[in-house]
């Protein structure tokens, strides 16, 4: 929840559930599998009406055993509804926006590549669009630890030192 994307997502979900007469209960496991199981048990004991699940540890069988409707975010479970972001289109849109603003020498900051996140395809689309339009683009990867600590300054300082003529991030 501490990552800005998920904070915004929780805020939007809370607004919508309130509008529909429900309360929102939020639990966070910080990518700890055991903590995630305990969080799900808390939800089960509180007899929630449904679960919006944005993680990758638990199995479809575990979610079904909770006996409440579940929807997942970017996580395919056979038989469960899933909400997908269009990361390819997002990458193209971001590149086109910056190119439309006049950027010619860009840097893309991505997540750690070996984690195989959905954001990887967004980065690939961004780079492809830059190449297609003849715009220079360097890719820098933030480590998984940077993502969770939200500590990007060393990487940002390095990017500015190595790319003094950069005009878009």
Pin down the residues of each PLM region.
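Short amphipathic alpha-helical surface micro-motifs
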Residues: 7, 51-54, 152
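Glycine-/small-residue-rich active-site loops that bind phosphorylated ligands and cofactors
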Residues: 1-2, 31-32, 58, 114-115, ...
């Amino acid at each position: 929840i501490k990552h800005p994307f998920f904070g915004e997502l929780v805020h939007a979900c809370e607004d919508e559930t309130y509008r529909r007469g429900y309360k929102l209960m939020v639990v966070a496991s910080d990518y700890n599998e055991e903590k995630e199981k305990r969080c799900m048990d808390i939800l089960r004991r509180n007899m929630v009406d449904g679960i919006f699940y944005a993680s990758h540890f638990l199995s479809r069988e575990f979610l079904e055993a909770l006996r409440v409707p579940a929807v997942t975010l970017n996580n395919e479970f056979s038989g469960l509804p899933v909400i997908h972001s269009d990361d390819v289109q997002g990458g193209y849109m971001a590149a086109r926006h910056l190119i439309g603003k006049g950027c010619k020498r860009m840097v893309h900051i991505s997540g750690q590549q070996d984690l195989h996140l959905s954001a990887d395809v967004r980065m690939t689309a961004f780079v492809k669009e830059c190449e297609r339009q003849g715009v220079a683009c360097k890719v820098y990867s933030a480590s998984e630890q940077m993502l969770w600590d939200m500590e990007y300054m060393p990487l940002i300082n390095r990017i500015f030192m190595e790319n003094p003529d950069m005009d878009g991030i």
